[in-house]
Amino acid sequence: MQRLLTPVRQVLRVKRAMQEASFMPPLLPPAAHQRFSTVPAVPVAKADTWPKDVGILALEVYFPAQYVDQTDLEKFDNVEAGRYTVGLGQTHMGFCSVQEDINSLCLTVVQRLMERTQLPWDSVGWLEVGTETIIDKSKSVKTVLMELFQDSGNTDIEGIDTTNACYGGTASLFNAANWVESSAWDGRYAVVVCGDIAVYPRGNSRPTGGAGAVAMLVGPEAPLALERGLRGTHMENAYDFYKPNATSEYPLVDGKLSIQCYLRALDRCYTLYRQKIEKQWKQAGIERHFTLDDLQFMIFHTPFCKLVQKSLARLMFSDFLLADSDTQSSLYKGLEAFRGQKLEDTYANKDIEKAFQKASLDLFNKKTKPSLYLSLHNGNMYTSSLYGCLASLLSQCSAQDLAGSRIGAFSYGSGLAASFYSLRVSQDASPGSPLEKLVSSVSDLPERLASRKRVSPEEFTEIMNQREQYYHKVNFTPPGDPNSLFPGTWYLERVDELYRRKYARHLV
């Protein structure tokens, strides 16, 4: 028995010595166990130890080389003129043939980002993909993208795919920023990729489709810095939009519920963001409400442009309910009849919707409309929609116009997950500055959109039928001509009998 107890005594002796040397705290008495918490009394890391201004350093956008005109689609679908162009606020819709899938879209946008920035491939230490376009239930898009890093020998890259409807891109951006600010950061860049192919069966939902991808370079000293501590997030269980059928690209959609979920999430995220920024202000000695006036620009996840206009009006309504009733601001002139309402009781109130859309029109034109250029001409890009709006804003404004501004951003993914956060733009807009370079890099967006091929609704419908036919098919070469793609585009070359996909790049 003595021999058996000896090792235990040795362990206790070592533990006691460690306690005396202050390597570990002494064991707590039994009564204290109930009060024990792993939460430190003070922050582990001080603010001045974090990398400064972590955010978006560079940005690249990809969209397909063909589109269908929404006016043509209205005629083809035998609906009244204006249903898609006015009712949805859309003019054109980009789409992919069978030659392109989510892997090829992401390959293209990452390659373009790295070529534009001229960064070495081994300078990336984090790569994460946000998408809801799933073509394999196990193998991630991220693993396919690793092919781009093969020649550099860089396999030490963290991150993986993130999925929840249209929210995955934002989750990936937050994760990348968290990595840069963490003890795991090794000084390299993070790359965030978000992309999707949004397709619907023929009918009322089809005109809300689109396709595209965005890649963002994330690191410190960024011209678009994520404001620390200023995120309002709301998540809940809802069946507004979901994809339970793995044999089809098409979702199940409750359109009315989805819009209500979007607006409810917007209300709650905006309220939480307001509370957090007002708390920061209070600590700095500032006592006032946060309003839209504190955002120079406001971008939204954009299923269709008309919903975004309603959403900005919704934020104005939220500000209005908090404003003093005796406020003489001309902004709220004629709206006093709507005092005393509760946000949660007004989602179906058309009078409030119309009144605040009218009252907020100038704010919309100034703060949000410039961000809708890509959405207007390409449609919904799901996870990359919000970041396509960011690219549009940068392409429609000068560096001087953007310098020093705060950009509000609302991200929404059905099911549902949503966040409201903000980006602080660098003050330096001088020639050659990071901000000026970023703005210049997307200045060709209108020109690139104008260079696409216009396709008839008949041909568009045939291509959609082909996508149905080849979805999850094996041992085939996709129909189509690679020469119809933009130069430098990756495309699906073949799927073999074991579902393995081979990709090639169209000549630059």
Swiss-Prot record:
Residue positions where N6-succinyllysine is found in the record: 52, 256, 310, 333, 342, 350, 354, 358, 473
Post-translational modification: Succinylated. Desuccinylated by SIRT5. Succinylation, at least at Lys-310, inhibits the enzymatic activity.
Residues that, per the record, bind (3S)-3-hydroxy-3-methylglutaryl-CoA: 80-81, 166, 204, 208, 258, 301, 310, 380, 414
CC per GO annotation: mitochondrion
Modified residue annotations for Phosphoserine: 433, 440, 456
Pathway: Metabolic intermediate biosynthesis; (R)-mevalonate biosynthesis; (R)-mevalonate from acetyl-CoA: step 2/3
Subcellular location: Mitochondrion
Main subcellular localisation: mitochondrion
Biological role: Catalyzes the first irreversible step in ketogenesis, condensing acetyl-CoA to acetoacetyl-CoA to form HMG-CoA, which is converted by HMG-CoA reductase (HMGCR) into mevalonate.
Organism: Sus scrofa (Pig)
GO molecular function: hydroxymethylglutaryl-CoA synthase activity; identical protein binding
Subunit relationships: Homodimer.
Residues with the N6-acetyllysine modification: 243, 256, 306, 310, 342, 350, 354, 358, 437, 473
NCBIfam families on file: HMG-CoA-S_euk
Protein name, UniProt field: Hydroxymethylglutaryl-CoA synthase, mitochondrial
Transit peptide: 1-37
PANTHER family on file: 3-HYDROXY-3-METHYLGLUTARYL COENZYME A SYNTHASE, HYDROXYMETHYLGLUTARYL-COA SYNTHASE, MITOCHONDRIAL
Entry keyword Mitochondrion: yes
PROSITE patterns named in the record: HMG_COA_SYNTHASE
Keyword match Oxidoreductase: no
Reaction it catalyzes: acetoacetyl-CoA + acetyl-CoA + H2O = (3S)-3-hydroxy-3-methylglutaryl-CoA + CoA + H(+)
Assigned keywords, A-Z: Acetylation, Cholesterol biosynthesis, Cholesterol metabolism, Lipid biosynthesis, Lipid metabolism, Mitochondrion, Phosphoprotein, Steroid biosynthesis, Steroid metabolism, Sterol biosynthesis, Sterol metabolism, Transferase, Transit peptide
Residues the record marks as active site: 132, 166, 301
Family annotation (Pfam families): HMG_CoA_synt_C, HMG_CoA_synt_N
